[in-house]
Amino acid sequence: MSVPTPHAALLSEIPIREHEVEVLGSSTHYWEYGPKDAEHTIVIAHGYRGDHHGFEPVIARMPQLRIIGPDLPGFGSSTPMTEASHNIDGYRRWLAGFIEALGLPTPPVVLGHSFGSMVATRAIAEGMPARALILVNPIATDPKIGAGVGITRLTRAFYGASRGLPRPLANALLRNWLVVQFMSMTLVTTDDPTLRTWIHEEHHRFFNGYSDPRTVADGFEASLEAEVGKAAPGVGVPTLLVAGENDTITPLDGQFRTVELFPDARLVVIPKVGHLIHYETPDAAATAILEFLDELA
């Protein structure tokens, strides 16, 4: 029996509209939350092998904002790009094209979560207009070593093996229940048994929502390209980093180093949580985001 979604009641009170737009050959599906006339509009770039659902626990706690959450190309309901590679440069080009296609009257606040933090930071550093930048669980340490060299090599071999298999076998490997469960168990830090169960169920629901094995393998290679600090000096907008005290994917010492690389940035550390801030501490994440937005001139 499934665990009820903790934020379902809050989310049900927010108007949600689904749209579709083509960007770099990707039929990109996106969801628009909240009032169209909100003071702030946020565009979200989600994490690796996730989709727009992932940040909904936080979105549900910010009903006053207009939030636009696309599925990145090749994940969720969005098809892969045909006019760009599925690397950080390709995804940053897609993000810039997506925001341009929205036709917003003013540049939005851009929020990057985990993998999306690299995409968003790189896009803004290379000239994409934005009002501000918010990074949740940002990749602030070299991703090849952040989680441990051994684990990274093993994971890289896993995705590399999927490339050489026929599609049905590759999908069977990538979507194996034990593989997804192991990944989920390594990320969860909460002691709340009900919340832990719900998070595992969420990963099983959405972690396998990718278009094809090659795109998901390309995405993993993209996730190893660079930490956000490489592009940080080129970000000329106010920036908020929201990090987990116990994040093993991108440890806290890297966050303290990285925040100093941005021209105008602050760091909020949420205690007793790891790489799943959006699932485990959505109230704290929403508070940090809203306080940051309130201080924007």
Predicted regions and their residues:
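Short glycine-enriched nucleophile-adjacent loop
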Residues: 117-128, 133
